[in-house]
Structures are given as structure tokens and as C-alpha cells.
Regions:
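Bacterial N-terminal signal peptides
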Residues: 1-9
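Amphipathic, alpha-helical segments enriched in basic
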Residues: 2, 71, 135, 147, ...
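Sec/Tat signal peptide C-region and signal peptidase I cleavage site
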Residues: 11-14
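Beta-strand-centric surfaces of beta-sandwich/beta-rich domains
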Residues: 16-519
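Extracytoplasmic
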Residues: 408, 509-672
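Short, low-complexity, charge-dense intrinsically disordered segments
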Residues: 673-677
Length: 677
């Protein structure tokens, strides 16, 4: 397996010849990431992004820049077929992804051949029922996202067309090699040698984890206690490369680990440069935050015994200094190990590894780009190789609607334009399920996308080369004021002398910002989602997170009744603390598919029927339902589905934000009833 990782070094001359096993090795070749890209080498992506997003040629202005119908965009239609992707060679398709592949056929034509090299239902590229797309590590689902990492090379051209019914959402990520590169034309029936390469790769990817070097140039270690403000540096002279780095912090427990791993900082400086190329809170550097969240991927991870590991290939010329700092108030016992190897190329043929943690750096000022959150901005020659995103989303709701956009070498329109943040990270439909894989991971999700979320994506084969500059953005729909807050660690290689604009971030901006929103209590209100369900004649009753529709619902939630029909009834238990006469009010939700309901209290009608139709999702009320004398104890609040507004979609949904009981004393008692509108 080590031979597959290292492999025979593939030359960097423009006129190179790559076999299929050579291309397979690129999926695990971490050293190749460090080599500086050749002129003419590009990695781009075709996707189903909303084609209304475009650029105005005369002015360069972005138009409909945040259009969001991203499921079915295509290049063009040819008769009954849709052209999904079209590339000139020599190149290789590295990655396919979809949120919902279906039975409509997708055909891949290579090198101007009249017959497709592959002709399958789109689902067939992902369900592992068709060779060679049947290796579980290369072809897999992750939190409802369908991924296929089987390389498909072509010499002169690649065209992907689809019949109707192919599904929803797609990505095709590919690299174009410099002119003169020779690659084989992909065939579904692989040779024995090609099959063997794929099998070995698949086995390796299924066994991701730390590979401690057994025969290295050197091993430098530190074990000790770092007091507040202390640091320790490990220094190595070159030329050489760090190929394995691991760290452990003793005594970490949740939730204290979240702050500790942000207080500890990892810095790496190459060749005595004035500023570190690597600067990150310790935990974030290894691809997960906040806290210690075990996972295993190809370049980095955290093992169950508490060892963080990174096996990025990190070359240097004269020197490398790896420094661990404790900027917190508590002493920390830490372990740090750094392994180096001899270079197998001249130092000048490599870029230097960069990894930087930041929050809200270099936000755009153009009015048309207010949603574009900058992931990375850099200048020079190098390769973008991945990112970890930590989201603090205390109100819940779907945070990741925004697309990724990559601008390479100053291009006016992004050559990578995605379809959603979770799509970029290889999953789909905002699914909160944790997953781990060689190339992408969801290492933390506190539940239903509420609280802390941590995701990463590693561009190993499909790294993005650039000659002059690289800018990456993620659209961010939820504002900081909501609050929904992003923090990212980005990873890239950059030629010496390139521009890395990211400075160290003070401790006060790294910890303490993840604060939950406060809710002003409503006197006498009983939250609908907290009411005990006594009986439901049909359908399903559950709590629904309403934070995605604004901040107007009490505690960002409601009781939600779905699947009802006219005449159905829902009985809820209402607890009254003391005997009194009460004004009864309720706050509901109105929406295009909500019904008309009649409320009852202990079998007696409460007011008139309430029409909950509206053309948009809106809070409604509080609606006065009259006054009632109620004894202390339990009572039955009933909801009867009476029908629907003629304008409403006939789904007969019902949402209750809260019911409020206000006691009336003898001086202020008001027996009048405000009728529902």
C-alpha cells in the first residue's frame, strides 16, 4: 500500500504520459499536491447551478448572482437530450456527485467516439451495481449525497449528456492537463492492471488513518507542560519535508476541550520567513472543531485514543520550525511529534504548505456580492487543497444553502460554481448525519443543524492549480446578526514569495463568541411544541424548527401537525396552575398549505374557525379565543381540521406557536372576545 501512496514519481515536464494506474495514484499522492502546477493545468467543474447567475459583459457586473434554482441547470439542450458537461482534453474526470440521481440515462462520450464509453441510468453511476463503479470507498453515499471518485480519462474530449428523468443536482469535477500530455481513453472494461490499481486504491481508502513513518530522516518530539503564554518549537534543517505530524493534549473533556483546543495554537514557519505559513488553533488544523471529534480521513484526523494526526506533504528548503503555543489561562500537558523525510525533487519544484484559520476576513464590499463569504484569497502560484468549515448556528434552520465559487487567475466568472454548501462537502439535503471518508467528513453536528456543525473537504486528485491567484467563496445566507457564524481553516500550497494575507487571530476572537440567543419569555404562554399529545386521529405531530422562516416564532419552534384530513382531530393536554377566569389566546402559523381549524377546550368551541392560509409562511396572532373559567389541573385542548381556503394547497397542515392563558381579576375582567381574523 505504501507503494501506491508514493508510487513512481511522475515527471513534471509538459510532454508527460500518464497511464491509468498513474491517474489512480493521484487519488492518494499527497506529495503531488506540493508540486508547483504547470502552465495549462486547470481543475474546473460543471454543475447544475442556476444559469440565471451570469456576468454582464459590458460592465463586468454580476447579475442574479444569488439565484438559487440550482437543481437542473444545463449547458444546452440538443433535441430531447440535455448537455451536462463538455470538456476538451487531455484530461480526467475525477469526481461525480448528485443529490438525487434517478433512472434517466446519462451517457459519457469520449474522444469524439460515436458511441458512449459509459451509458447508464444516472443512479447506476452511484449504486455500485455496475463495474467499474462498484468500489465502496470510491463510490459511496454520505449523509444522502452520492459520490463517485472513479477516474475517467480522455485524450481529446469528453461530453456528458442526459435523458429526461436523470434526477436533481450534479457536479462533474475534472482536470485539464497541459497540451502534449498523453492519457488513455477510459473503457468500462478495465484491463487487469487497471482493475488491480483500483482495487488497491479502494482497500487503502477503506483503511484511512495515521501511517506513522517507519523509515524517516528524523523524528523530533516534545512532551511537557505548556503554561499560560508558553510555547515550544521543534526545528529541523533542510532540504527535507515534514510528512507526518501528530499531537495530543492530555485531560481534555467536553465542553472544556472546545476552549482548550482554540487556546492552543500551531505555527509552522518555512525557511526562516518573517511570518508563519501555518497558523491555526490546534484542533482546527486537524480538520475538526470545536473540540475533539474523532474521525479518520486521508490527510488528517483524530484517533479514538486522542492523537490528532496530519500527513500532508510539507517540503522546505533551508529550515522548518514547528511551534506550539498556549495562549490560554490554564497549563496544558501536550505531546508533539514531527517526522521528516528527504526530498525526492529539487526544493524549488515544490510549493510551501499553508494552512490558515480565520473568521470573516476580506468580506466583499460590492452590493451584488453581499452573500459571498471569502473562504480563501491568495496570490502567486500554487494549488488549493481543501477546507474545514465550523458553523455556529444556535437558532437552527438550514445554514448551507449557499454555493461555492472559485475564481482562478483573475477570471471574471468562476470556473467552479456549485449548488449548495453541503453539496460542496459531498453530502445533500442538509442532512445532519455524521460521516467520515478519505476526502470529506461531517465530524460534528449537534442535531438538526442547530448548534455546532463541522465539515471538511480535501481536494486530493481534484486539487485546484493556479498560476497567479485564487479566490474561493461560499455563499452565506444567514447573517452574523442572526447569529450564524463561520470559521474556516483553509489549506493550500504556494510558491515561495507568494502572497498569504492571513494574520494570526487574537484569542478573544477565537473563543467565547458561540453564544446562544436569549429568548424573552411571554407571560402565561405555553409553547405549542411542549404540549402533551393525548390523541391524534390521523397524521403525525412533532416539533418543527421555525428559525429558517425568521425570528418571530417563540423559541424558534412550533407544534406541527401533518397528514390530516377534514374532520380529523388532535387532542392536547393543557395544564392550568390555579383556578381562575382566563383570557385565552393562541399564536399560529399561516402558510400556503395550511388548513382551517376549529379549536375546542374541554369539548366546547373556542371562538370561530381560524383560516391559516397565507401566500407565505408567516406568524399569525396572538388570536383571542374568548374567556373561560378554568379549574386548576389538566384540560383538553382540541384542534379539529375543518377544511381549507380555496386558495390553499390541500395539505391541511396546522402549526401552533403557543397558547396563552392570562388570568383576569375582578377589576380588569373583560368578557369580550376578539374574533379571529
Amino acid at each position: 500500500m505504501a507503494l501506491l501512496i508514493l508510487g513512481p514519481l511522475i515527471g513534471t515536464a509538459a510532454a508527460q504520459s500518464l497511464t491509468y494506474p498513474d491517474l489512480v495514484r493521484r487519488l492518494v499522492d499527497l506529495e503531488h499536491l506540493a508540486t508547483l502546477p504547470q502552465a495549462g493545468e486547470r481543475t474546473t467543474q460543471w454543475s447544475s447551478y442556476d444559469r440565471r447567475s451570469r456576468i454582464e459583459p459590458a460592465t463586468g457586473r454580476f447579475l442574479d448572482w444569488h439565484a438559487n434554482a440550482d437543481g437542473h441547470g444545463v449547458i444546452r439542450r440538443e433535441g430531447n437530450l440535455q448537455v451536462l458537461a463538455e470538456m476538451k482534453g487531455p484530461g480526467v474526470l475525477w469526481r461525480m456527485w448528485s443529490a438525487s440521481p434517478k433512472q434517466g440515462r446519462v451517457r459519457i462520450y469520449l474522444d469524439d467516439a460515436p458511441e458512449p464509453a459509459v451509458d447508464l441510468p444516472f443512479l447506476g453511476y452511484f449504486n455500485r451495481e455496475h463495474a467499474p463503479f462498484d468500489r465502496p470507498a470510491l463510490v459511496h453515499t454520505a449523509a444522502r449525497g452520492w459520490n463517485n471518485y472513479t477516474p475517467i480519462p480522455y485524450q481529446t474530449s469528453c461530453k456528458i449528456v442526459a435523458e429526461e428523468g436523470w434526477g436533481d443536482y450534479y457536479h462533474f469535477t475534472y482536470t485539464t492537463f497541459p497540451e502534449g500530455t498523453v492519457v488513455p481513453t477510459f473503457r468500462s472494461e478495465l484491463s487487469a492492471e487497471d482493475r488491480s490499481a483500483l482495487e488497491e486504491l479502494d482497500r487503502l481508502l477503506q483503511q484511512c488513518g495515521p501511517r506513522v513513518p517507519q523509515d524517516s530522516l528524523g523524528r523530533d518530539t516534545f512532551e511537557g507542560i505548556l503554561g499560560p503564554g508558553d510555547g515550544h518549537a521543534l526545528r529541523r534543517t533542510g532540504p527535507a519535508a515534514i510528512t507526518f505530524l501528530r499531537a495530543r493534549v492530555e485531560g481534555l473533556t467536553r465542553p472544556a476541550d472546545e476552549e482548550a483546543l482554540r487556546e492552543l495554537v500551531l505555527e509552522i514557519t518555512w525557511d526562516d520567513e518573517a511570518r508563519p505559513a501555518v497558523w491555526s488553533p490546534l484542533g482546527d488544523f486537524f480538520g475538526t472543531a470545536p473540540g475533539a471529534n474523532p474521525y479518520r480521513s486521508l490527510p488528517c484526523g483524530l484517533t479514538e485514543d486522542g492523537w490528532f494526526y496530519a500527513q500532508w506533504y510539507m517540503p522546505f528548503g533551508r529550515s522548518a520550525e514547528v511551534r506550539l503555543l498556549n495562549e490560554g489561562a490554564q497549563p496544558r500537558k501536550v505531546h508533539l511529534e514531527v517526522f521528516t523525510e528527504r526530498l525526492r525533487r529539487p526544493p524549488e519544484s515544490y510549493g510551501r504548505f499553508h494552512a490558515k484559520w480565520h473568521r470573516d476576513e476580506f468580506l466583499p464590499t460590492e452590493a451584488t456580492r453581499e452573500l459571498d463569504w471569502p473562504l480563501l484569497k491568495t496570490r502567486g502560484r500554487g494549488r488549493y487543497v481543501g477546507a474545514m468549515l465550523h458553523v455556529w448556528n444556535p437558532r437552527g434552520g438550514w445554514w448551507g444553502e449557499g454555493d461555492e465559487k472559485f475564481f482562478v487567475d483573475g477570471e471574471p466568472f468562476p470556473s467552479t460554481f456549485g449548488t449548495g454548501s453541503e453539496d460542496y462537502f459531498g453530502y445533500a439535503w442538509g442532512c445532519p448525519d455524521l460521516f467520515q471518508h478519505a476526502y470529506h467528513n461531517q465530524t460534528r453536528n449537534d442535531g438538526n443543524n442547530k448548534g455546532h456543525i463541522s465539515v471538511n473537504r480535501w481536494h486530493i486528485a481534484e486539487q485546484v492549480p493556479f498560476q497567479e491567484s485564487f479566490e474561493a467563496y461560499l455563499e452565506k445566507y444567514f447573517s452574523n446578526g442572526r447569529p450564524t457564524l463561520y470559521a474556516a481553516t483553509v489549506y493550500w500550497y504556494l510558491a515561495p514569495g507568494g502572497h498569504d494575507p492571513y494574520a494570526p487571530v487574537p484569542l478573544e476572537h477565537r473563543v467565547g463568541y458561540a453564544r446562544a440567543p436569549s429568548y424573552k419569555p411571554i407571560p402565561g404562554a405555553v409553547e405549542g411544541e411542549r404540549l402533551k399529545i393525548l390523541e391524534c386521529s390521523r397524521g403525525r405531530v412533532r416539533e418543527q424548527d421555525m428559525s429558517g422562516w425568521g425570528e418571530d416564532w417563540s423559541h424558534d419552534a412550533q407544534l406541527w401537525w401533518t397528514g390530516a384530513q377534514p374532520g380529523d382531530r388532535l387532542d392536547l393536554e393543557l395544564v392550568v396552575e390555579r383556578t381562575a377566569r382566563y383570557r385565552v389566546e393562541a399564536r399560529f402559523t399561516r402558510a400556503p398549505d395550511y388548513g382551517i381549524v376549529q379549536l375546542f377546550l374541554n369539548g366546547a368551541k373556542l371562538g370561530h374557525p381560524v383560516d391559516l392560509y397565507a401566500p407565505a409562511v408567516l406568524p399569525f396572532g396572538p388570536v383571542s379565543l374568548g374567556t373561560n373559567a378554568l379549574a386548576a389541573g389538566t384540560h383538553v385542548l382540541s384542534v379539529e381540521m375543518a377544511g381549507a381556503n380555496p386558495e390553499a394547497a390541500p395539505a391541511y397542515l396546522f402549526g401552533l406557536d403557543y397558547i396563552r392563558l392570562t388570568p383576569l381579576d375582578s377589576q380588569s375582567e373583560d368578557l369580550s372576545t376578539d374574533e379571529p381574523r
